[in-house]
Amino acid sequence: MNRRKTTSRGTSAAMKISHQPPRLLIVNIAVPSWVDICPNLCEALQNFFSIACSLMGPSRMSLFSLYTVQNQHECVLPFVQVRGNFIRLQACISELRMLQVEGCHRPPHALLPLAIEDGLQQFKQYSSHMASSAAQPWTSLEITVLTSRPGKEVVKELEEGLKDINLLSVRRLQVAEVTKGIQERSDSPSPTEEPSNDESSILEADIVLETLDNDVVSMEVFFKAWLHNSETDQENIHLLLTPQSLPPPSRAKDHPICLKCDLQERFLSPSLLPGTADGVSRIDDPKGDISTLYQMASLASASPYKLQVVKALKSSGICESLTYGLPFILRPTSCWQLDWDELETNQQHFHALCHCLLKRDWLLLARGEPLIHKHNQSLPACSFYVITPSHSLTLLVKLVATRELMLPGFFPLLSEDPPEDSLKIIESTLDSLDLGLTYNPLHVGSHLYSHLSSAHAKPQGRLYTSCASRGLRKGGQLQTNRVRAAVVPLPVAPAPRRALKMTAASKASSAAFLPSDSEEGEEERPSHT
């Protein structure tokens, strides 16, 4: 993708986690595939939002809006706050699920660009309305078009239809083509990303084409990518390699190596979700384990958080019982402020480090450089991390215990074989177990989705009543008087009676500018267990 500097990039690193871009999802409905896609899509969306609406700590997803495009484009859900709004999002998903029995026709080619233009207009009006009350206004959004049509055909349609549209407020425009076949899933199935053709350079925003399997798990993984920190204003971590960490030539003392890295979570901390962690009360900060390395890296606004490598270790030289907290992934930075040569050199050095560590069977022990404030004269405590290489272009980082944290313990080695009778009983029991080659977390469910959904299901008669009334259809036709967007949707063609409905529609839609009571309460209420 082309690296542009047209959108606002002034966000401080302290806001990286909490100021994620709004999301606009446009579902391009077409028969006959919609009948197969709809159940999987709706289940994946419900599972995703049960997590996204429940997460404590910094907000990972600010606003969300949903459009559908079939024989016309329609705003099913205007931009709303995600946190604390599960009931409203669930009603939207229920409405989306009903579309599978309405008889969908192949949408006209002009409707997708119209839906994007309509969503942009709604976003701009919402942003300008909320600019005075928001701590930091939203200046850009990400748009996803979900379709079962050939992806390249949709990309070409968007390139043609959007060439005269101002897309400076679009941070990313992606087309996700849902395929009918289900490919074999690995540990973390990820969508296949393809750049669009050269003609997309005429647009002010690049179009990214991805393919997505038509199953619930793949769609969940696709939507959960929205929870990642997507800011590229500044690299998160500086990994400092001292001469003692890797034995380079003697002249390396004059050329210290600093690898610039971005930080990525491997999974969500259970402490960020209500009713998890096996019922044990959390004595840590409500933000959970994210308050360690991830939070330190985000709060280092003046400069990236530094990890100073102290020494190398043999991979068998550390006991797993000494590591704690959430693991994190280090990868070469994609910071937009670095020039291409520096980015390429940094990635090559990172690749070489992974290769050398694997070849030598080494780990790295690193010290987190504390953030020393001028007004604090005492030396702050620091944390130590063990860094493990992988066969991909990533490093695994885990906290490791230090002397101050250790408790006495003596664990003698097994000195002799166990009694023969006990050995036979245990061996027979073990032989009855299923043996798997690997652990795949995507095949193991903990009923967390249903638990979180039930926790959100509180009686709200007014909302359910309005949802049910919106879902009614008359004579198999769509309701033409249903307008819930923050702006009046763009017409496909001029209609004589349209002007008569504009005033009423504008009044009805103005309420969408204001957050609901639950949204306001959620913003003001501090996170707690």
From Swiss-Prot:
Expressed in germ cells of the testis. Expressed from spermatogonia to spermatids. Expressed at very low levels in lung, stomach, thymus. Not detected in Sertoli cells. InterPro entries: M1AP. The keyword Transcription does not apply. Disruption phenotype: Males show reduced testicular size and a tubular defects, which led to severe oligozoospermia and infertility. Spermatocytes are eliminated via apoptosis either at the pachytene checkpoint, or later at the spindle checkpoint during metaphase I. Residues 180-201, 504-529 are annotated as: Disordered. GO terms for cellular component: cytoplasm; membrane. It comes from the Eukaryota. Disulfide bonds: none annotated. Residues 188-200 have a biased composition (Polar residues). GO terms for biological process: cell differentiation; chromatin organization; female gamete generation; male meiosis chromosome separation; meiosis I; RNA processing; spermatogenesis. Its main location: cytoplasm. The modification Phosphoserine is found at residue 516. Keywords: Cytoplasm, Differentiation, Phosphoprotein, Spermatogenesis. It is found in: Cytoplasm. GO terms for molecular function: identical protein binding. Seems to synergize with Cbfb and Myh11 during the onset of acute myeloid leukemia. Required for meiosis I progression during spermatogenesis. This is Meiosis 1 arrest protein. The gene is M1ap.
